[in-house]
UniProtKB/Swiss-Prot annotation:
<dbReference type="InterPro" id="IPR024581">
    <property type="entry name" value="TBD"/>
</dbReference>
<feature type="region of interest" description="Homodimerization">
    <location>
        <begin position="1"/>
        <end position="280"/>
    </location>
</feature>
<comment type="subunit">
    <text>Homodimer. May form a heterodimer with NAP1. Interacts with TKB1 and IKBKE. Weakly interacts with DDX3X.</text>
</comment>
<keyword id="KW-0175">Coiled coil</keyword>
<dbReference type="Pfam" id="PF12845">
    <property type="entry name" value="TBD"/>
</dbReference>
<keyword id="KW-0597">Phosphoprotein</keyword>
<keyword id="KW-0862">Zinc</keyword>
<feature type="compositionally biased region" description="Pro residues">
    <location>
        <begin position="416"/>
        <end position="433"/>
    </location>
</feature>
<feature type="region of interest" description="Interaction with TBK1 and IKBKE">
    <location>
        <begin position="281"/>
        <end position="330"/>
    </location>
</feature>
<keyword id="KW-0863">Zinc-finger</keyword>
<feature type="modified residue" description="Phosphoserine">
    <location>
        <position position="400"/>
    </location>
</feature>
<feature type="binding site">
    <location>
        <position position="582"/>
    </location>
    <ligand>
        <name>Zn(2+)</name>
    </ligand>
</feature>
<protein>
    <recommendedName>
        <fullName>TANK-binding kinase 1-binding protein 1</fullName>
    </recommendedName>
</protein>
<feature type="modified residue" description="Phosphoserine">
    <location>
        <position position="365"/>
    </location>
</feature>
<feature type="modified residue" description="Phosphoserine">
    <location>
        <position position="184"/>
    </location>
</feature>
<keyword id="KW-0399">Innate immunity</keyword>
<keyword id="KW-0391">Immunity</keyword>
């Protein structure tokens, strides 16, 4: 480092100059004076000294950096590509001792700083305590000042009372002096006391103060009498003050007693309110439980009633099919030559009684087979009933039959009914005021009647025996939802006694007979006349009635009560509406949406609201 600056520093020496070169400000130059030369030379020497000092500082910094670099190399040795570590000589480890010394010094300074910090914290705590004590003293001082003000006000009131008594005594003395004017000279009125405290001292002080403002009485007895009166008045005032203090203490004791009684009354009232609230809660829980039980009973009765209605509807369909088959057989006997001419299929033997006509003709023509949408498979009713016709065509069984008044033959299209069961002769349509048998049978009960039947009965006491369920359960009575009770298994009797087909049909007519007031509500729209009106209407009317099977084939399990009766109650509010929607969130549902799924949706609302 020193060799770097040797060339630059050599310019300050005279020897570094060449023989032909001389100092510009040298002493040999006659153009410059001696003072100028000495000044410039001194400036150069000063600059040279500064530069040397700077170079020394830089050298020291470089040495420090070298030591630190060596320490870092010792701490983090470099590994070569061949896996060998750089070795360091022992003299380089001496810098570690310097670092240890610096570390010790820094640790000492750190401890000193921590000690000072702890002292400052203690001083701050002491200062905080002093501030708190000062604040307490200020509060006590303010309290004492208020008490002193109260005492001063009390003293002033007492002094005013004493001044009033003194004035009264002066007036009485003036009257007495006027009465005894012949015995004593006129009394000089006492001057007003400017200060109340001085007046009080004069009143209770020694003889010098006592006679300062009073005239010298001629007789000692009069002054003694007045003094005694004043002392008596003062004692009376002191007695009144003591009585007032006693009354104040009594009132304070009474106030404390009343406060204790008030606290006791508040505690007893809170306990009474808590007990009443618990009783009210228990009563509410009991009432809600009773309501749920009543709803469960009513809902179970509703399901049983719906099961009976389904049984009646299936029985009605069976009766109607039997009547239609009998009418078709009677018509087939009259039109058997025509049916044999149109149907090339072989005849089917009939197991009917001997009074019946001979075996029926072929059941269906090829054209009818091409046009009929129903596959030619025998129905279960044909396999079970011995009185049913042996026609293999399932049209009379698959399509629900209706009375002859609602069927009309099609002259343009060949009927799919087999020749042995031809369609009856067309009849004129009934008048508008008179309903057909199917309309009377399938009359829909009004919604308010359904709700009344649901909410009217609350127990099982009104029911004698259950009706028999026949056929598969409908989609809305499947045991998929936990909130719907399962239908019960019953025998082959309805309401405790067997029913004949004629009595059952009459019972259905009477049960579903529509009231005159509901004529407009459930009147069925009149369909336009068409060639196939009877066939289409029969299929649409009886599509919901499956072919009845044996009652023992499909028996339902024991009924279980529902668990969400509020959901069922909310569901009953939408019985009479055409659009199915949730009564809580007003969410719309399709027309064929099942009731159990809608009840599940309402249950989710009730569970979220913790009802």
């Amino acid at each position: 480092m020193e060799s770097m600056f040797e060339d630059d520093i050599s310019i300050l020496t005279q020897e570094a100059l060449g023989p032909s070169e001389v100092w510009l400000d040298g002493p040999g130059d006659p153009s410059l004076g001696g003072d100028m030369c000495s000044a410039s030379h001194f400036a150069l020497i000063t600059a040279y000294g500064d530069i040397k000092e700077r170079l020394g500082g830089l050298e020291r910094e470089n040495a420090t950096l070298r030591r630190r670099l060596k320490v870092y190399e010792i701490k983090y040795p470099l590994i070569t590509d061949f896996g060998e570590e750089h070795g360091f000589p022992l003299y380089e480890l001496k810098d570690g001792s310097l670092l240890e010394v610096e570390k010790v010094s820094l640790q000492q300074r750190l401890n000193q700083f921590q000690h000072e910090l702890q002292k400052s914290k203690e001083q701050e705590e002491q200062l905080g305590e002093m501030i708190q004590a000062y604040e307490k003293l200020c509060v006590e001082k303010s309290d004492l000042e208020t008490e002193l003000g109260e005492m001063r006000a009390l003293v002033e009131t007492h002094l005013r009372q004493i001044c009033g008594l003194e004035k009264q005594l002066q007036q009485q003395q003036g009257l007495r002096d006027a009465a005894f004017s012949s015995l004593s000279p006129p009394a000089v009125p006492a001057s007003a006391c400017p200060d109340l405290d001085l007046h009080y001292l004069a009143l209770r002080g020694g003889p010098a103060l006592g006679h300062a403002g009073w005239p010298g009485p001629t007789s000692v007895s009069v002054s003694e009498l007045e003094r005694r009166r004043l002392e008596e008045a003062l004692e009376a005032a002191q007695g009144e003050a003591r009585g007032a203090q006693l009354r104040e203490e009594q009132l304070q004791a009474e106030c404390e007693r009343l406060q204790g009684e008030l606290k006791q009354l508040q505690e007893t009232r809170a306990q009474d309110l808590a007990s009443n609230q618990s009783e009210c809660d228990m009563a509410w829980v009991k009432r809600v439980g009773d309501d749920q039980v009543n709803l469960a009973l009513a809902y179970t009765e509703l399901t049983e009633e719906l099961g009976r209605l389904r049984e009646l509807s299936s029985l009605q369909g069976r009766i109607l099919r039997t009547l239609l088959q009998e009418q078709a057989r009677n018509a087939g006997q009259r039109h058997s030559p025509l049916s044999q001419r149109h149907s090339p299929a072989p005849a089917c033997p009939s197991p009917s009684p001997p009074a019946r006509p001979p075996p029926c003709a072929p059941c269906q023509s090829p054209a009818a087979q091409r046009r009929s949408p129903v596959p030619p498979c025998p129905s279960p009713q044909q396999r079970r009933s011995p009185a049913s016709p042996s026609c293999p065509s399932p049209v009379p069984q698959r399509r629900s039959p209706v009375p002859p008044s609602c069927q009309s033959p099609s002259p343009q299209r060949r009927s799919p009914v087999p020749p042995s069961c031809p369609a009856p002769q067309p009849r004129p349509p009934p008048p508008p005021g008179e309903r057909t048998l199917a309309e009377r049978v399938y009359a829909k009960p009004p919604s308010h009647h359904a709700k009344a039947g649901f909410q009217g009965r609350r127990s099982y006491s009104e029911l004698a025996e259950g009706a028999a369920y026949a056929g598969a359960s409908p989609a809305w009575l499947q045991a998929e939802a936990a909130t719907l009770p399962k239908p019960r298994a019953y025998g082959g009797e309805l309401y405790g006694r067997p029913l004949s087909p004629r009595r059952a049909f009459e019972g259905i007519r009477l049960r579903f007979e529509k009231q005159p007031s509901e004529e407009e509500e459930w009147a069925m729209p009149a369909s336009p006349p068409s060639p196939e009106a009877g066939t289409i209407r029969c299929a649409s009317f009886c599509a919901g009635f499956p072919i009845p099977e044996s009652p023992a084939a499909t028996a339902y399990a024991h009924a279980e009560h529902a668990q969400s009766w509020p959901s069922i109650n909310l569901l009953m509010e939408t019985v009479g509406s055409d659009i199915r929607s949730c009564p809580l969130c007003q969410l719309g549902f399709p027309v064929g949406y099942p009731d159990d799924a809608l009840i599940k949706h309402i249950d989710s609302h009730l569970e979220n609201s913790k009802i």
